[in-house]
Curated annotation (Swiss-Prot):
Protein name: UDP-N-acetylglucosamine 1-carboxyvinyltransferase
InterPro entries found in the cross-reference section: Enolpyruvate_Tfrase_dom, Enolpyruvate_Tfrase_sf, MurA_subfamily, RNA3'P_cycl/enolpyr_Trfase_a/b, UDP_GlcNAc_COvinyl_MurA
Keyword Transferase: yes
Gene from which this protein is expressed: murA
Organism encoding this protein: Bordetella petrii (strain ATCC BAA-461 / DSM 12804 / CCUG 43448)
Top-level lineage group: Bacteria
Length: 422
C-alpha cells in the first residue's frame, strides 16, 4: 500500500488550487440517474470516491466519462441494473445516494448497506423513514436496502436529526414525486445548496435550500444540464491548518471563503493572518499558533470534518485547547497516532484536551479515516525529523493529489508506492 514520507520543518509558501468539493460531487453524480439526458459537470475532483461512484453508475448502465479537460459527463439513458452491489458500496458510504434517484425515476432500488470511514454508526434509518413517508415500500433484507414504489407521493418529512446525506437523498427523491414535499430539520450545508442548484437547472422546483426547511414541488421529468461543482471547503480548511501548524504564507485559488466562516474564525483566533477575495483565501502564520478550542456542529457551525485538522494545529500551539465532538462518536482515532509523535492529548468521552508542545517528533503513524489522515500529514509537516503515514488510501478518498500540492508549496513530502497486500 502507498505511504507518505514527510520531512518536517519546511514552511509552506506559494499558491495552490482547491479542487471541487467531494461532498458535492458525489450527490451531483447520482443526480444523473434522474434524467435520460446528459449532465455535463465541471470541477469534479479526481478522487478515489468519485472514481468509485463513476464505477457504480457504470455498473448500472450509466455512461460515465471523464474527459482530458476534467469535464465529467454522465448519461443515464440506458440504465439496466437497479442494484448497488456490496463490492462497490462497501468502500464508500455516499453510495446510499443512488437510492432516492433510482426510486424516483425507476420505481425500485436495491442498495447494499454502505461502508466508508469507520466513524461511528452513521445509520441510514432516516433515509428509510423519509422514503417510506414518500410512499415507498422499503425494508432491509440480507444486507440490502430494498425499495419500490409506483410513483412517490409528496409528504411533509421531519428527520429525527440533521442528516446531510439524508437531506440529499430525500431531495433527489422528491423532485420527481407527485405533489409537494416539505423537508423539515433539513441540513443547510453548501453542498446541499449546490445539489439543489443543479436540480433546478434540470427543471426541478425547489425553494428554501440553505435553510432548515426545503419545499419541493414535484415535476414529471427532468432534463440535462451543465454545472460546475463548488470548491471543497474542507480541502481549503485543511491547507490553512497546515500553514498554521508549519508556518508560512499561502494563497488558495478556486476557493469559496463564504462557505468557511466558522473555520476562518477559528484560524484567526489561532493567530493566522487571513485575507479573502471572491474566489481566493490567503493564510499566513509566523511563530507558533495560539491554542483554540472548538465544538463541532452542523453547518454553519464548525465542521466535524475539520476537527482532526484543527487538533493537529493545536498539538504545536501555545496553550491548551478543548475540542468537543458533537456529531459522530468514535472520531478521535487519530489521537493515539498524534501521541506517537509527542502530542499531549487527553480524551474523556466526546471531549479532547490538547496541551500544545513546542515541537512534535516524526514517527511512523497509521491513518484510520479520511480526515484523520489529513491531521497526520499536518502533524508531519510541523514535526522534527521524518514522519511516515501509512494507509493513505484513506487520504486519497477525499484529497486530490495532496502531496503534489503540498510539494508545490515547499513541503518535503513524497509518496512511496507499493503493491496492495494479497
Amino acid at each position: 500500500m502507498d505511504k507518505l514520507r514527510i520531512t518536517g520543518g519546511a514552511q509552506l509558501r506559494g499558491e495552490v488550487t482547491i479542487s471541487g468539493a467531494k461532498n458535492s460531487a458525489l450527490p451531483i453524480l447520482c443526480a444523473g440517474l434522474l434524467t435520460a439526458d446528459p449532465l455535463v459537470l465541471a470541477n469534479v475532483p479526481d478522487l478515489n470516491d468519485t472514481s468509485t461512484m463513476l464505477r457504480l453508475l457504470g455498473r448500472m448502465g450509466v455512461r460515465a466519462e471523464r474527459g482530458a479537460d476534467g469535464i465529467v459527463t454522465v448519461q443515464a439513458s440506458q440504465v439496466d441494473n437497479l442494484e448497488a452491489p456490496y463490492d462497490l458500496v462497501k468502500t464508500m458510504r455516499a453510495s446510499i445516494l443512488v437510492l432516492g434517484p433510482l426510486l424516483a425515476r425507476f420505481g425500485q432500488a436495491r442498495v447494499s448497506l454502505p461502508g466508508g470511514c469507520t466513524i461511528g454508526q452513521r445509520p441510514v434509518d432516516q433515509h428509510i423513514k423519509g422514503m417510506a413517508a414518500l410512499g415507498a415500500d422499503i425494508r432491509i433484507e440480507h444486507g440490502f436496502v430494498v425499495a419500490q414504489a409506483a410513483r412517490l407521493k409528496g409528504a411533509s418529512i421531519r428527520t429525527d436529526m440533521v442528516t446531510v446525506t439524508g437531506t440529499e437523498n430525500l431531495l433527489m427523491a422528491a423532485v420527481l414525486a407527485e405533489g409537494q414535499t416539505v423537508l423539515e430539520n433539513a441540513a443547510r450545508e453548501p453542498e446541499i445548496v449546490d445539489l439543489a442548484e443543479l436540480l433546478i437547472k434540470m427543471g426541478a422546483r425547489i425553494q428554501g435550500h440553505g435553510t432548515d426547511r426545503i419545499v419541493i414541488d414535484g415535476v414529471a421529468s427532468l432534463h440535462g444540464a451543465e454545472h460546475s461543482v463548488i470548491p471543497d471547503r474542507i480541502e481549503a480548511g485543511t491547507f490553512l491548518c497546515a500553514v498554521g501548524a508549519a508556518g508560512g504564507d499561502i494563497t488558495l485559488r478556486n476557493a469559496a471563503p463564504d462557505t468557511l466562516g466558522a473555520t476562518l474564525d477559528k484560524l484567526i483566533e489561532a493567530g493566522l493572518t487571513i485575507e479573502t477575495g471572491p474566489d481566493w483565501i490567503r493564510g499566513a502564520m509566523q511563530g507558533r499558533p495560539r491554542a483554540v478550542g472548538a465544538r463541532t456542529h452542523e453547518y454553519p457551525g464548525f465542521a466535524t470534518d475539520m476537527q482532526a485538522q484543527l487538533m493537529a494545529l493545536d498539538t504545536v500551539a501555545q496553550g491548551t485547547a478543548v475540542i468537543v465532538e458533537n456529531i459522530f462518536e468514535n472520531r478521535y482515532m487519530h489521537v493515539q497516532e498524534l501521541r506517537r509523535m509527542g502530542a499531549d492529548i487527553d480524551i474523556d468521552g466526546h471531549t479532547a484536551v490538547v496541551r500544545g508542545v513546542p515541537r512534535l517528533s516524526g514517527a511512523a503513524v497509521m491513518a484510520t479515516d479520511l480526515r484523520a489522515s489529513a491531521s497526520l500529514v499536518i502533524a508531519g509537516l510541523a514535526a522534527e525529523g521524518q514522519t511516515q503515514v501509512d494507509r493513505i488510501y484513506h487520504l486519497d478518498r477525499g484529497y486530490d493529489r495532496m502531496e503534489v500540492k503540498l510539494r508545490a508549496l515547499g513541503a518535503n513530502i513524497q509518496r512511496l508506492t507499493g503493491k496492495e497486500p494479497a
